Amino acid sequence: MAKKEDTIVLEGRVKELLPGMHFKILLENGMPVTAHLCGKMRMSNIRLLVGDRVTVEMSAYDLTKARVVYRHR
């Protein structure tokens, strides 16, 4: 399991909604990633729409997948 030091925190925008609470996110650096909601966002019933600005955490070992940890207002 990745340690907290191994995560990369970036910001991006939701570009596409995928089945199973997955999303296509376009990061600020132009890189597209596939992301899912973190557990606390699922439990709080926080929904994302296309165009929402989000903060994602990525593992340093797989830069194609991410976890959405915050939706900006």
Curated annotation (Swiss-Prot):
Name assigned to this protein: Translation initiation factor IF-1
InterPro entries: NA-bd_OB-fold, RNA-binding_domain_S1_IF1, S1_domain, TIF_IF1
Quaternary context: Component of the 30S ribosomal translation pre-initiation complex which assembles on the 30S ribosome in the order IF-2 and IF-3, IF-1 and N-formylmethionyl-tRNA(fMet); mRNA recruitment can occur at any time during PIC assembly.
Functional note: One of the essential components for the initiation of protein synthesis. Stabilizes the binding of IF-2 and IF-3 on the 30S subunit to which N-formylmethionyl-tRNA(fMet) subsequently binds. Helps modulate mRNA selection, yielding the 30S pre-initiation complex (PIC). Upon addition of the 50S ribosomal subunit IF-1, IF-2 and IF-3 are released leaving the mature 70S translation initiation complex.
A Pfam family recorded for this sequence: eIF-1a
Cellular component, GO, one term: cytosol
The keyword S-adenosyl-L-methionine belongs to this UniProt entry's keyword annotation: no
Predominant location: cytoplasm
Native organism: Chlamydia abortus (strain DSM 27085 / S26/3) (Chlamydophila abortus)
GO molecular function, one term: translation initiation factor activity
Family (UniProt): Belongs to the IF-1 family.
Location of the S1-like domain: 1-73
Compartment(s) of residence: Cytoplasm
UniProt keywords, alphabetically: Cytoplasm, Initiation factor, Protein biosynthesis, RNA-binding, rRNA-binding
Keyword Zinc-finger applies: no
